[in-house]
Amino acid sequence: QDSENQGTYTSAVLGSGVPILIKIGEEYIESAELLSFITDKKIYEYPDVVFSTTIKNLGNTHISPIGEISITNIFGQEIDRIKFNESSQSLLRENSGIYEDEWYNKALLSEENKVMFGPMKANLVSTYRTISPGFAPLTAETTFWIIPWKIILGTATAIVLLILILRKKKK
């Protein structure tokens, strides 16, 4: 044995498993309430928005809310649509869960040349029923602003400098 490492022992035990949710019994109640649908900030420089949705499971079985978040601009044009709870994360009975979904775009114009700055509106439409057929929507709306202030400041500075230069040349 190496005398330098004598008495030193490291062990790592790794384990993994897949959680399995089983429904037992006959009387399932699927009921949920949408407690909040908000963004992490009210003003953004670029479309890098995190939507946070809190849902409370009021039923006696687990649910997996899924849906879509549609984003519209100042002109009411839908500029993007993202999945809500794309991973289908379940919510156990009598618990609340917070779901975070991100909308990210580097541009200020959509692929269809729709404006992606100014006041924006996001609409969430989610469903959660799996056992009995039917439509049980959870809907909410939130607003936020996208203000590219660096671009605005740079443009305004350039305009002011241009005006000052033109005035000096006229004199």
Predicted features by range, described:
Residues S11-A12, G134:
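A general structural signal for short secondary-structure junctions and capping/turn motifs
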Residues T155-L161:
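Alpha-helical membrane-embedded segments
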Residues G25-G154:
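Membrane-proximal extracellular "stem/stalk" segments
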Residues T8-S11, G17-I22, A140-F144:
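C-terminal edge beta-strand
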Residues Q1-E4:
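A short beta-strand micro-motif common to beta-rich folds, especially ectodomain repeats
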Residues L161-K171:
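C-terminal membrane-anchoring or membrane-association module
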Residues S16, E30, D101, R167-K169:
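Functionally constrained cores in energy, signaling, and assembly domains
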